[in-house]
Amino acid sequence: MGIEVLNGYGITECSPVIAVNRNNYKKDGSVGQVIKGGKVKIVDNEILFKDNSVMLGYYKDTETTDMVLKKGWFYTGDYGYLDVDNFLFITGRKKNLIILSNGENVSPEVIESELLHEEGVCEVIVYAKDNKIMASIYP
């Protein structure tokens, strides 16, 4: 059809765009470069975003607001990294961590990403069951 699909990244609290790939500025696996005027930093693998488009807070919920807004930075709850060209890559979700009995934190998205590179794997979901990491793989 000749339609090119480009990834972007945004959330409601940030009205809504944080990063976007563009026709001439794109990178495979990335959600794009951070929007003009916006700032991203990574703290403990979590994506933080700062811009005048970020919400002021959650309506009548100062407790949650205080958890996600600190010194003007919005804590997205998403894991990722910026490369040297300022392209943002999403690697997982903070709330998706599997915590094993030995205290080890495992990101299911990292394992899923690796498994998807295997021949014959079309879809995969990684989860915890009985303190073991399990995967359902669909060819």
What are these regions (language model features)?
Residues 10, 32, 78, 103:
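Active-site glycine-centered loops adjacent to acidic/histidine catalytic or metal-binding residues
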Residues 30-36, 44-68, 104-106:
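Conserved ATP/PPi-binding loop(s) of AMP-dependent carboxylate-activating enzymes
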